[in-house]
Structures are given as C-alpha cells and as structure tokens.
C-alpha cells in the first residue's frame, strides 16, 4: 500500500516505498529543539548563517522582481529602482510572513530550511518544524541587517550580484558565515 507523504509523516514517518522489487525503508523524525531554539526571541547562534543566507535570498528575489516591473533603465540598460522604491521593497521583505522557512536536522545538525537555502546533499526525507518563533526571528534578523548596513549599501551590493549581497550581509571576518564563526559552530 502506498501512502502520500503527509500521511507517512502522520503515521510515524515509517513506510515502505518503491516498486515491487526494490523496497526501501525511509524514516524521519522531527528535530529535538533545546530551550534556546524553542523559547528565545533571537535567532540561535548556530542558525545565524542560514538565517542570513535566507534574508539575502529574499532581498535579492524581491529586488529583482521590483526591477523587472520598473521602467527606469540606468546607463547600462538595466532597470534601476528609485531610493524610495528599493527602501519600500526591503522593508516589505523584512515584514513578510517568512512561513516557508523552518528548521530540520541534517546529519545530527539543525539547519534552517526554505527557499534559497539548499546547499549540499539533502536527506531523502526529513521533517521541518516551521511557524512558532521562526518567522519572527527571521523578520528580526532581516531588520537587523537593514539597520546595520542601510538600504543604500544593501541595494548597491545587490546591483553587483546576489553573491555580493550575501557577502555583504553574511561574510566578513565577523559575519555569521565567516570561517571563524562556522568553526565555532561545528565545535558545539
């Protein structure tokens, strides 16, 4: 008997899938969250790199969408947004509901998951915990970057490419995705 994925998760995340000759057993369980992950108003330190990458992705997506609608090309023929427009777009990015993001566990390590975050091999099946404190934490993280760098600097980095935007927000020697910070995260 084959069950759709939501039913598999509902019935303990165990099922036998595949064709008649090649049966594969898959199982998944929800990540076990510690008190900080459950109750803190702030993004836990070990998830800040993922959160930063999610924010950079959403900013880039929304700015690109706004530029596609714009009718004001710059000297190179690309669409350039007015300051008031990109300020509004970035503010709306941070104010969105962030419901498509959550936390799951990969190789005994908790990671944020959602649009713009898949890097490396993903598990064949996993359980994501979304809602709860995660949308508010991502919104706060987004507004933190707006305050730290400002809309002008963020838009300028975006105009140089998505990689530059992510480097501005997440890189640097003390950024959440710096090698030093990631090494400390792995030690935990």
Curated annotation (Swiss-Prot):
**InterPro entries assigned:** DUF3456 (IPR021852), MZB1 (IPR052682)
For this chain, the annotated S-S bridges are 49-177, 52-170, 94-142
UniProt key word Transmembrane helix: no
Q: What is this protein's function?
A: Associates with immunoglobulin M (IgM) heavy and light chains and promotes IgM assembly and secretion. May exert its effect by acting as a molecular chaperone or as an oxidoreductase as it displays a low level of oxidoreductase activity. Helps to diversify peripheral B-cell functions by regulating Ca(2+) stores, antibody secretion and integrin activation. Acts as a hormone-regulated adipokine/pro-inflammatory cytokine that is implicated in causing chronic inflammation, affecting cellular expansion and blunting insulin response in adipocytes. May have a role in the onset of insulin resistance.
The record's family statement is: Belongs to the MZB1 family.
GO BP terms, alphabetized: integrin activation; positive regulation of cell population proliferation; positive regulation of immunoglobulin production; regulation of B cell proliferation; regulation of cell population proliferation; regulation of insulin receptor signaling pathway
Q: Where is this motif: Prevents secretion from ER?
A: 185-188
The UniProt-reported impact of residue 52 to A is:
Reduced electrophoretic mobility
- Post-translational modification comment from the UniProt entry: Forms an interchain disulfide bond with IgM monomers.
State the name under which the record lists this protein. Answer: Marginal zone B- and B1-cell-specific protein
Task: Tell me where it resides.
Answer: Endoplasmic reticulum; Endoplasmic reticulum lumen; Secreted
- Keywords in alphabetical order: Disulfide bond, Endoplasmic reticulum, Secreted, Signal
Q: Which body tissues produce this protein?
A: Expressed predominantly in the spleen and lymph nodes. Abundantly expressed in marginal zone B and B1 cells. High expression in mesenteric adipose tissue (MAT). Expressed also in pancreas, perigonadal adipose tissue (PAT), uterus, subcutaneous adipose tissue, heart, muscle, ovary and liver. Very low expression is detected in brown adipose tissue. In PAT, significantly higher expression in stromal-vascular cell than in adipocytes. Expressed in macrophage RAW 264.7 cell line.
Query: Could you describe the subunit structure of this protein?
Result: Part of the ER chaperone complex, a multi-protein complex in the endoplasmic reticulum containing a large number of molecular chaperones which associates with unassembled incompletely folded immunoglobulin heavy chains. Interacts with HSP90B1 and PDIA3 in a calcium-dependent manner.
Kindly indicate where the leader peptide sits in this chain: 1-20
Q: Give the source species.
A: Mus musculus (Mouse)
Q: Would you say which domain of life the source belongs to?
A: Eukaryota
The terms describing its cellular component in GO are:
endoplasmic reticulum chaperone complex; endoplasmic reticulum lumen; extracellular region
């Amino acid at each position: 008997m084959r069950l759709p994925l939501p039913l598999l998760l509902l019935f303990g995340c165990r099922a036998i899938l595949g064709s008649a000759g090649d049966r594969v057993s898959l199982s998944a369980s929800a990540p076990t969250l510690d008190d900080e992950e459950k109750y803190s108003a702030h993004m836990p330190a070990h998830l800040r790199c993922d959160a930063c990458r999610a924010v950079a992705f959403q900013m880039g997506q929304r700015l690109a969408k706004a530029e596609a609608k714009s009718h004001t090309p710059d000297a190179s023929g690309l669409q350039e947004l007015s300051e008031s427009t990109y300020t509004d777009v970035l503010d709306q990015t941070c104010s969105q509901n962030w419901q498509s993001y959550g936390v799951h566990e990969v190789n005994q390590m908790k990671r944020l998951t959602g649009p713009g975050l898949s890097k490396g091999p993903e598990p064949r099946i996993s359980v994501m915990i979304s809602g709860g404190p995660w949308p508010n934490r991502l919104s706060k993280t987004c507004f933190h970057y707006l305050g730290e760098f400002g809309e002008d600097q963020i838009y300028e980095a975006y105009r140089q490419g998505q990689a530059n935007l992510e480097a501005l927000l997440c890189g640097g020697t003390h950024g959440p995705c710096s090698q030093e910070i990631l090494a400390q995260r792995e030690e935990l």
